[in-house]
Amino acid sequence: MKIAVLLGGISRERPISLKSGENVLKALKKLGHDVVPIDVDENFLEIAPKLKEFEVVFNALHGHFGEDGTVQAILDWVGVSYTGSKVLASAICFDKVMTYRVLDGYVNFPEYTIVKKPVKESPYGFPCVIKPRKEGSSIGVHICDNSNQLYNDLSEELKKYNEMMIQRYIEGRELTVSILEIGKPQILPVLELKPKRRFYDYTAKYVSGMTEFILPAPLSVEEYQKVANSSLRAFELCGCEGFARVDGILKDNVFYVLELNTIPGLTDLSDMPASAKAAGMSFEELVDAIIQTAVR
């Protein structure tokens, strides 16, 4: 099969996308496919029509432009099959506020408010969490313990973003749930994350040895059902397709969804490949399964 792999991109997650894309390229070549890498830049719209010559496009982009529905809209315009969720689901899941609006009343998530200028008070007390409304890889996320830290961190981040979220801090077990459509959406073994830092931030995600993976997460039957049901519900409500990852916190038998990732990382340290491995899937088998979701 002739497959194009989109990688790199123009977001702050470019370094991670390059790693994901390189791993996907290697896997597809091992599987015997004719593979062409495409490093996406601002001129993507000009070259996009050439993608018609490919049977499938594997989208390994992360962050703005590649994961927010923009590239998906271009690929739909070209008329080529591609991996992952389509335009609407991608746009919803990349915008945490829109994600929560869709999930409201169906799935638990931490309370939040939006600010467009620095403030010193949190509606939820301290510690609290601040994060960009639209961003990935925990970029721009801070846990603030007092008024001064809240004000200073917001001041810094609002130089980069038009608005920020202040969210209730929930101290619990960090879980990530990888979902793969094999006929229907199925949950891979739930992964519990134990970062050596305060939370699963950019460094904990991408520096080897900074996070302990516990697979499968030790959950009671009741806990597993709540985590699984909430994750599948979120996947379906947001209209996700192919594959995705649901990140959340388990506390007092309640699973709080933090976000949905429509293009999960596929680096050597990423969560979804680890969960797939725990399910008995090699990385090549995972990539092949993702490709199959695009050609069905």
UniProtKB/Swiss-Prot annotation:
Q: Does the keyword Manganese apply?
A: yes
Listed binding positions for ATP are: 125-176
Which Pfam families does this entry report, sorted A to Z?
Dala_Dala_lig_C, Dala_Dala_lig_N
Cofactor(s) this protein cannot do without: Mg(2+); Mn(2+)
- The superkingdom of the source organism is Bacteria
The residues listed in the UniProt record as binding Mg(2+) 2, with positions renumbered to this chain, are: 259, 261
**Which family would the database say this protein is a member of?**
Belongs to the D-alanine--D-alanine ligase family.
What name is this protein filed under? D-alanine--D-alanine ligase
